[in-house]
Amino acid sequence: MQFKDLQLNKHILRAISEKGYEIPTQVQMQTIPLMLAKKDVIASAQTGTGKTAAFALPILQGLFDKQDPSKKGKKIRALVVSPTRELAIQIEESFRDYGKYTNLKTAVVFGGTAIDPQVKILKNGVDILIATPGRLLDLHKQELVNLSFIETLVLDEADLMLDMGFIDDVKKIERLCPKSKQIALFSATMPHKVVALAQTILNKPEKVDVTPLYATAQGVNQVLYYVPKTKKMELCLHLLRNTIKGDILIFRRTKFVVDKLEKMLRKKRL
């Protein structure tokens, strides 16, 4: 199967092609038709599986097919809720890349930064909004964002969102949207609290599970170190200098700590 077989319009296919994509991933193949059919979806998919495109492409397709030029950007019709600013920014960039030929307007709002520039963007009109829970509710409380016309609500990284204590915020956001909306919930894991949330807010959801049978590829050795937070940098330096050889890929939770680690490694000439 190729993207052209998923009933996506020529504008979206052109953008996908320019990014060099031809064959959809498993989560995309399973999720896109369901979302195009306006089904609620609960998907178990880890980062790196292509899940952002799995919900971005059908949202863009659906809004493009129904768009009225006279109402462009006048109402927020799709909302993606993400737990962190870094993820929210990445998602908005993906929407802009995939929707560059659709004329649909996107915006991202998140906390930890000035609210006025975000308000200005919202006032200019938005079709698709990507937001972190706290900032979204702040904007709604000040009557600066209207969720009354949402057609599709996406909850991304739901397990992380609940781990960060956003359960009440997520439920409130869901209630602020129309009852008739489509909901798609994506989560890397499916603990009881995520399943319980899905049972509460989703309507007869279709299930998508692309969790690998074996989480670690063959030939990969796993080692776990229990280390205090204050000793993480020290351990990292020790491993880089004495244990790990060849090319190295390091993951950290946020952009801030990645930048901090990168500066430290440069200082140590590693």
Kindly label every feature range from the protein language model.
Residues 2-270:
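Conserved helicase RecA-like core
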